[in-house]
């Protein structure tokens, strides 16, 4: 059975309102990452309870050259980073709005991720994050990553703090 967040993802995946497009564009512009360490292509939906976004692991990404060189797969640390960027940082930017500045500091405080399937070169993944709590500048979320077949690749809990100056 799909959770309410997954149902919302599948509905919103096919329809994105103009206000959502503007909101997600602003969030993406505020992300403190750039290529080659940006793992967010698009935000499908975002509200005060969670966020859904996508990223495609292009075949030319540098880490594939050495991570199981004869059968490259995406490293778990990169999958975790992708879930943190979409599921934690994008949601945090949405929640604090314009309080985030270039001087703001981001810190991952804890992760507990279970890896279930590999992610191969060229695969597009979807990250779905549900807020557990946001208090005292700490955001904790339940996150899951789905492959293009809607199979769960990995899932768990991620928490972090963004210090707003």
PLM regions: where:
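Active-site helix/loop of acyl-thioester processing domains in fatty-acid/polyketide metabolism
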Residues: 43, 74-100
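Hydrophobic beta-strand-centered segment that forms part of the acyl-chain substrate-binding groove
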Residues: 15, 19-21, 88-128, 153-155
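Non-catalytic linker/capping segments at the edges of enzyme domains
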Residues: 2-73, 102-104, 120, 138-140, ...
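C-terminal domain-closing interface element
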Residues: 125-152
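Short alpha-helical scaffold segments that flank and stabilize functional sites
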Residues: 56, 87-90, 132
